[in-house]
């Protein structure tokens, strides 16, 4: 992967100080960016408008959300939002930005000590559906002002070229994520890429079998949530089981978006699971387990958001009750050795889903010794 604009990037000893306090400049950030940054802050556990623990010399991260208006939701015009940050990374895409976001997030996993040990932070800012050069250049200029790095996924060769040139001229360190992949596939297939963006008028949008299969899977999964319609468990591709708050519903939804019909069944202490569960082919059933203290913490957070009384809280998140529920689930798993049991403690949904799909396909494909998940395009 090539890094562009390295020569124009600030040297560490000449990097301008990050303004703090009331003198911090206001940055122009789109409403989409503002909402996305807020979501990132919530997922990472950082409270909005509150400083995180830091050393005296480390920058403070603060995310402040402006009140969106109906007009702002429809347009991508810039608004004034004050953001105090450590290092910034811009993600620019002519589509949803999914590829750029997930690629960079995967890479950032290699630098966890940057925020943990150095007391600093990295803020990623997503700019999606960037399909005109004027807006592209405006974003890169803003990146230059912030001393940000820029990653882009632009299918149009002209736009990708403009992004590289602008980053080089403005001294912005940049990476073209999609370009090398497109070039490699073009060479392998022996054909030229279309160069059309995801939403281009000339692009053929076919509603193929895979599309309808995905819609059908999502609809099925929604209807089968939380043990509903147990008589349909045999129709599921994958069945997830486990005690409350092990992530069955979000995991089911995530896997369903990949075209798999997923059902989930909760284990409630003292209540035997439906008989139809034990009639499902064992390789399709996946048990979820989690560490005791982690599950208790998740449940405590849940009951606080619901505002229940102390007695109800103890009946749901009390340590003795949680331990008994986990033991109850373990006994069911022991009686069904054909089920794969996965520890979801501190795992992202994507990680658990990847494990489940690998095991699911391992059990189906016996034609090769190397596990694979195959798709046709």
From Swiss-Prot:
MF term (GO), any: protein kinase activity
Main location: cytoplasm
Stretch forming the signal peptide: none
Superkingdom classification of source: Eukaryota
Cellular component per GO, a single term: cytosol
Catalyzed reactions: N(tele)-phospho-L-histidyl/L-threonyl-[pyruvate, phosphate dikinase] + ADP = N(tele)-phospho-L-histidyl/O-phospho-L-threonyl-[pyruvate, phosphate dikinase] + AMP + H(+); N(tele)-phospho-L-histidyl/O-phospho-L-threonyl-[pyruvate, phosphate dikinase] + phosphate + H(+) = N(tele)-phospho-L-histidyl/L-threonyl-[pyruvate, phosphate dikinase] + diphosphate
UniProt activity-regulation remark: Regulated by light/dark exposure.
Ranges of Low complexity composition bias in the record: 22-33
Tissue expression as described in the entry: Expressed in pollen and seeds.
UniProtKB keywords: Cytoplasm, Kinase, Nucleotide-binding, Serine/threonine-protein kinase, Transferase
Binding site for ADP: 242-249
Pfam assignment, any one: Kinase-PPPase
Subcellular location: Cytoplasm
Region of interest (Disordered), residue spans: 1-76
Note from the entry: Was thought to be devoided of phosphorylase activity, but possess a much slower rate of phosphotransferase than PDRP1.
Protein family per UniProt: Belongs to the pyruvate, phosphate/water dikinase regulatory protein family. PDRP subfamily.
HAMAP family recorded: PDRP
Protein name (record): Pyruvate, phosphate dikinase regulatory protein 2
Gene (UniProt): RP2
């Amino acid at each position: 992967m090539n890094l562009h604009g390295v020569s124009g990037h600030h040297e560490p000893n000449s990097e301008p100080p990050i303004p703090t306090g009331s003198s911090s400049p206001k940055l122009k950030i789109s409403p989409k960016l503002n909402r996305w940054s807020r979501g990132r802050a919530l997922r990472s556990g950082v409270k909005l408008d509150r400083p995180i623990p830091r050393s005296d010399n480390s920058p403070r991260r603060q995310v402040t959300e402006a009140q969106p208006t109906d007009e702002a939701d429809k347009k991508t015009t810039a608004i004034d939002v004050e953001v105090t940050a450590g290092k910034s990374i811009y993600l620019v895409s002519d589509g949803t930005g999914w590829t750029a976001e997930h690629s960079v997030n995967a890479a950032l996993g290699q630098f966890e000590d940057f925020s943990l040990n150095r007391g600093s932070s990295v803020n990623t800012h997503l700019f999606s559906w960037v399909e005109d050069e004027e807006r592209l250049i405006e974003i890169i200029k803003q990146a230059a002002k912030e001393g940000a790095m820029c990653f882009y996924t632009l299918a149009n060769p002209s736009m990708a070229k403009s992004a590289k040139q602008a980053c080089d001229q403005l001294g912005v360190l940049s990476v073209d994520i999609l370009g090398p992949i497109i070039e490699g596939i073009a060479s392998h297939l022996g054909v030229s890429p279309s160069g059309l963006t995801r939403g281009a008028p000339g692009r053929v949008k076919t509603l193929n079998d895979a599309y309808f299969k995905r819609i059908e899977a999502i609809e099925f999964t929604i209807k089968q949530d939380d043990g509903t319609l147990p008589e349909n468990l045999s129709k599921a591709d994958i069945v997830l089981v486990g005690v409350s708050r092990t992530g069955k519903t979000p995991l089911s939804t995530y896997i369903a978006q990949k075209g798999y019909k997923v059902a989930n069944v909760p284990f409630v202490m003292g209540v035997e699971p439906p008989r139809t569960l034990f009639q499902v082919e064992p390789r399709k059933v996946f048990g979820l387990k989690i560490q005791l203290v982690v599950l208790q913490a998740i449940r405590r957070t849940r009951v606080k958001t619901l505002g229940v009384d102390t007695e109800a809280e103890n009946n749901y998140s009390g340590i003795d009750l949680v331990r008994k529920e986990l033991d109850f689930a373990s006994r069911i798993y022991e009686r069904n050795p054909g089920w794969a049991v996965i520890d979801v403690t501190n795992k992202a949904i994507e990680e658990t889903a990847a494990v489940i799909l690998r095991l699911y396909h391992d059990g189906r494909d016996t034609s090769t010794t190397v596990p694979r998940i195959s798709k046709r395009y």
